[in-house]
Amino acid sequence: MVSNGPKYGGTCSRGNTLGIEKVSKRAPRTSVIVINWNGKHFLDTCLTALRRQTFKDFETILVDNGSSDGSQEHVRANFPEVRLLALGENLGFTGGNIAGWNEARGELIILLNNDTEVHPQWLESIHEAALAYPEAGGFACKMLMFDERTRIDNCGFDLGATGTSFDLGRGRADGPEWRSPREVFGACGGAAVYRRKMLEKVGFFDDDFFMTFEDVDLNFRAQLQGFKCMFVPGAIVYHHLRGTMRKHNARQTFFSQRNNEYFYLKNMPLALLVRFLPRRILYEVGAFAYFCLLGQARPFLAAKLDVLKNLGPLLRKRQRVQRERTLSAGELRRMMCADTLGNDLRRRWAKFRGALPATLRRRSRVTEGIS
């Protein structure tokens, strides 16, 4: 159920209420929050890379979401510098990060997936960018494929009119166009950097999301209040794509399709909701057909029903977001991806073809050649 909460994002309360370990008196300049749930096999690579950073003024907070694979014991025995926040249950990516944020002390708050390995100069590059772009409230890292390190996972994301977030550079070679800073709509939550002052103004993650699209929602709120996001090419992160999440399971489908509606209805200005309605309808029809092909029609429909059940609280959150918005609808429209409808339809068609049996994929290619 959607809760109103103290704001339209996650709680900003402070204090050591969750039994976190190893709290020093001096606050570090940066807090790195790593979420873990039964990911012990990733932790040596992730935490050792943090230990090797050239920039040293930071703390690592590992939030363990009630793991049963010995993750907590492994961290205590092998990484004594890590502040371990052991939760008694799985609060999801969203709830785990909110717990970490409530204990973080740095002026820069960095979220990092446990299935990553960061370059030794990762933090140094982030701090150089923070000094170079004081007007930016957030920063996106260059995420490369873990097993193919010259190919991009993402360099932040842009937003389309239908509510689709497009991972910038996904699957492309790491060429010259990805070696210069640029403004992007937002940072992927797998390696995202936020200024504390921005989070204290716009709120952190919305704890109703649990997982997926919480990063899009946060970046959307930040943009609406005038906080830009910069891509930092030197902040290199190697990422096991979906290393900690299975693709196309019912739970993932439910949260992704519910939360897509949550962030879209909560943040999109009314003028653009009306303007983009035909595109949004086409998007929903295409999404439903796609999930039917995957045998995921039930969780898809359950997600949409859940949105309707919680529409009242969601609209109250929307009122707060729109009341504090400083960005005009026209300015937001100019920030969005060009040719969004065409991009969405091509993306859906590519997914359809990938989900079809091989014989039908061959037929679709023949049909394309004839038309």
What are these regions (language model features)?
Residues 28-31, 59, 217:
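Cell-envelope/extracellular polymer assembly enzymes that use nucleotide-activated donors
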Residues 48-57:
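Short, acidic, metal-binding catalytic loop of nucleotide-sugar glycosyltransferases
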Residues 72-103:
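Conserved donor nucleotide-binding strand/loop of the catalytic core
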Residues 109:
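Short aromatic/hydrophobic "clamp" motif used to bind/position activated sugar donors
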Residues 116-160, 164:
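Conserved donor NDP-sugar-binding/catalytic core segment of glycosyltransferases
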Residues 160-185, 200:
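Short, flexible, basic/aromatic active-site loop/helix in glycosyltransferases
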Residues 185-236:
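A short, conserved alpha-helix in the catalytic core of glycosyltransferases
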Residues 228-335, 339-343, 354-357:
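Active-site-adjacent helix/loop segment of glycosyltransferases
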